[in-house]
Amino acid sequence: MRLTAKQVTWLKVSLHLAGLLPFLWLVWAINHGGLGADPVKDIQHFTGRTALKFLLATLLITPLARYAKQPLLIRTRRLLGLWCFAWATLHLTSYALLELGVNNLALLGKELITRPYLTLGIISWVILLALAFTSTQAMQRKLGKHWQQLHNFVYLVAILAPIHYLWSVKIISPQPLIYAGLAVLLLALRYKKLLSLFNRLRKQAHNKLSL
């Protein structure tokens, strides 16, 4: 049985709650000693993992809608993507304000360049910023065919973000490996599309070099 528009609306409400509740928990944990011995790192990792969860959920929607024959599920994809960006912004903000501190924000640019895992993180965030800014139907109409080309960069984020996570932890634990494995699986479900994109980019690069 296919989902109705009303059911999808309620699903969106549930997904908004799923995006908001972790923030409420984090606020509670900060104020009631619910974090570990290094609360700054805990906040950074929590916000980063939550952003990654929403990224994976966003990537899950298209294959799930296709294989489950639930086309209306696609309507939830933008919502999940925006929550991914929101949590990624919290993640970046927590690093800038809590790790570096307000008085050392001038060092942020240097940190992002000299630490490779931070470079991957900021590249991912900039891409998510562009995708969030252009996620409306008005922007889709304005950009035309270029809209899909831009939003294909989400697949690059799906590669860079798990690497950023793996690189950022001092001791490799199962958790970042699980996230990386899920990202690989979700990308593998799109191997035909990704192969087509790769061949197109290679052809364009070859044509430019031939000029």
Swiss-Prot record:
Q: How does it sit in the membrane?
A: Multi-pass membrane protein
Q: Which UniProt keywords apply?
A: Cell inner membrane, Cell membrane, Electron transport, Flavoprotein, FMN, Heme, Iron, Membrane, Metal-binding, Transmembrane, Transmembrane helix, Transport
Q: Which family does it belong to?
A: Belongs to the MsrQ family.
How this chain assembles, per its entry, is: Heterodimer of a catalytic subunit (MsrP) and a heme-binding subunit (MsrQ).
* Family matches, as InterPro entries: Fe3_Rdtase_TM_dom, MsrQ-like
Q: Where in the cell is it found?
A: Cell inner membrane
Q: What is this protein called?
A: Protein-methionine-sulfoxide reductase heme-binding subunit MsrQ
Principal subcellular localisation of the protein: membrane
| GO biological process annotation, one example | protein repair
Organism whose genome encodes this protein = Shigella boydii serotype 4 (strain Sb227)
Q: Name one Pfam family in it.
A: Ferric_reduct
Function, in words: Part of the MsrPQ system that repairs oxidized periplasmic proteins containing methionine sulfoxide residues (Met-O), using respiratory chain electrons. Thus protects these proteins from oxidative-stress damage caused by reactive species of oxygen and chlorine generated by the host defense mechanisms. MsrPQ is essential for the maintenance of envelope integrity under bleach stress, rescuing a wide series of structurally unrelated periplasmic proteins from methionine oxidation, including the primary periplasmic chaperone SurA and the lipoprotein Pal.
The cofactors it requires, by name, are: FMN; heme b
